Amino acid sequence: MLDINQFIEDKGGNPELIRQSQKARNASVEIVDEIISDYKDWVKTRFELDELNKKFNKLQKDIGLKFKNKEDASGLLAEKEKLTQQKKELTEKEQQEDKDLKKKVFQVGNIVHPSVVVSNDEENNELVRTWKPEDLEAVGPIASVTGKPASLSHHEILLRLDGYDPDRGVKICGHRGYFFRNYGVFLNQALINYGLQFLAAKGYIPLQAPVMMNKELMSKTAQLSEFDEELYKVIDGEDEKYLIATSEQPISAYHSGEWFEKPQEQLPIHYVGYSSCFRREAGSHGKDAWGVFRVHAFEKIEQFVITEPEKSWEEFEKMISYSEEFYKSLKLPYRIVGIVSGELNNAAAKKYDLEAWFPYQKEYKELVSCSNCTDYQSRNLEIRCGIKKMGDREKKYVHCLNSTLAATQRALCCILENYQTEDGLVVPEVLRKYIPGEPEFLPFVNELPKNSTSSKDKKKKN
């Protein structure tokens, strides 16, 4: 969340900057003035409460003197009873106003970085750069690694490898359910192990995150819309927890309430998080319904960085470069796009997506999101850095950044389409050592059902 002082000019804030940021996000601009008005009301109530406390404390002393001098204090005691009730009512009013004020501030997004394209249409996302293997003339309906026609979709390749079973998965857990089988298991695990080793070699500290979070901490790291569209709730009596949608959520809270007093020595910290992740995908009905590209349960390797504010943009570029290096090692064509202001989540000041090429579907699809959340998360989680010097108006908070390295099911889908041949799948060289027998090639063992996706597409063309 933003600092309330940023809304108040007398506190050194710049409410107009917040208004412009909200406008860029296509979000409520009016809420800024509502917050300013509510803040003034809260300050007034807080002042009245302070004055009442002073009056109450003086009355306490006067009563004490009456008792000490063995004088009648009945009048003062009656006044104390009256003030006690007033104090109770005013305290409740102040607490409610403070709660309502913070709730509104929490709805305001991070300040959009000046370099972000202002638009509410993702068609206007900025194309930052593209990459493809040197021996690939251009992306198209050809598997980029094998040079063979991409005649099958990723889920069909898995079916022909006997690598997954969607029918029994749906029977057991419902929509988008699946089992990995045989080499489907090994390929997914290979991506997990390769991703962990890849970032560990760059100095990242591996963390295997818990897959459930308590409501209090989840509410400090996830925005309200995610509770409705993404998160699964787990209830045990009165104990309420949420399944994580990404390891970013528990890792962002890993240092909650902590203070890095010597940031030049202690920061930056680079974490590589590994976890199973769970998403309801309530807002994605019917989207990417094929295979394991968009499912309710998946594994993900995540980058998470905690740094001094002065170095966060340097770390942002470094994180996306590591994700690029990872996909270059897998020889998957991709492009980097800067997400427009209206599509940013509340915490992100700027976000890059890495979209990789799927030759059967003839389109780029998102595999990576890399965000600089500046101090938006750390302020809510109270993760501070440095010693507050005399004259400083504000406490100094760390900056938090996150980036996917690989949501392994999605990355596997892209590998399947780009490494296919007529007879099977070439195994990416960097993954072979993580698979039993270190195979170079996996032959098809199953035929496709007559109503498969590619069969339907061929009928349409004919």
UniProtKB/Swiss-Prot annotation:
Keywords: Aminoacyl-tRNA synthetase, ATP-binding, Cytoplasm, Isopeptide bond, Ligase, Nucleotide-binding, Protein biosynthesis, Ubl conjugation. Conjugated to URM1, a ubiquitin-like protein, in response to oxidative stresses. The attachment of URM1 to lysine residues exclusively depends on the presence of a peroxidatic cysteine in the target protein, with low specificity for the particular residue, motif, or structural context at which urmylation can occur. The URM1-conjugation reaction is mechanistically and directly coupled to the process of cysteine persulfidation, transfering the sulfur atom of the URM1 thiocarboxyl group to redox-active cysteine residues in the target protein if it is exposed to oxidative conditions. GO terms for biological process: cytoplasmic translation; positive regulation of tRNA methylation; seryl-tRNA aminoacylation. The keyword Protein biosynthesis applies. Belongs to the class-II aminoacyl-tRNA synthetase family. Type-1 seryl-tRNA synthetase subfamily. Consists of two distinct domains, a catalytic core and a N-terminal extension that is involved in tRNA binding. This is Serine--tRNA ligase, cytoplasmic.
